[in-house]
Amino acid sequence: MALENASLVTEFILMGLTNQPDLQIPLFLVFLMTYMITTLGNLALILLIVLNSHLHTPMYFFLFNLSFIDLCHCSVFTPKMLMNFVLKKNVISYEGCMTQFYFFCFLVISEWYVLTAMAYDRYVAICNPLFYNVVMSPKMCSYLMLGSYLVGFSDAMMHTGGLLRLTFCRRNINHYFCEIVPLLELSCTSTYVNEMQLFIVAGKNIIVPTLLIFISYGFILSSILKMSSTAGRSKAFSTCSSHIIVVSLFFGSCAYMYLKPSSSGSLDQGKISSVFYNIVVPMMNPLIYSLRNKDVKIALKKVLTKRKF
């Protein structure tokens, strides 16, 4: 069935973060700066990992994928949002809306599992260091990443397919991008299946990775406490702290958005929460991993030194 026949609506209007005219230009400047920092930070980290052979390890392979996802993630909706700040009519086509929503789902879900794979990598490195190179082989790392992307692909297809079956009678999306919760509000057909699907799939994709990460760090903490060397403990804590910060920020904001009861907060609260995991976290990731990682600092110094000479 053609997309035009699937819905009474052929385009949507994105209401944005706020309808106050005085805030449009300041918000445009803030999010433009944020987007530039996010893009340059993640791109720099990707290039740093590619150009430095001593960073070609499982840990940085996962970090490379995380930065790649964050780079794509922020580019899915930020350019459109920036345009909407300066345009009078914030229109997005039906096809464009569904495409934006699909890639948003794909990238967010993939990131959940990439972060889980990173926790497993730290578990093997600290709890089973003698077997690290055997367990975290290039083949194993590739399988973990392929699995992360496949889960993201299949779940995004499921959610997008569910939206394509709906008939939309209204077109004002109370959000700055095509997000599933405000989209369901516009349907004039039953959204019960979509809501159940959202709760089950989002619950699975947040709770299962969170449990796996908690279990991994439970074993890691146990191993660290058994270490007799203070230097060893300090190095282990330093290695894991960046990942723990990123996981807490990302999973916490996603859980608040998708697992809270629908009556406990308005769509405006959802906008604020989504700004956090869509914009703030991708911007913070390269900064957190760079500032707290000795290997990245050394690699950056080498690159800067080479450029001077």
Which residue stretches match the model-derived regions?
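Transmembrane helical core of 7TM receptor-like proteins
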Residues: 1-309
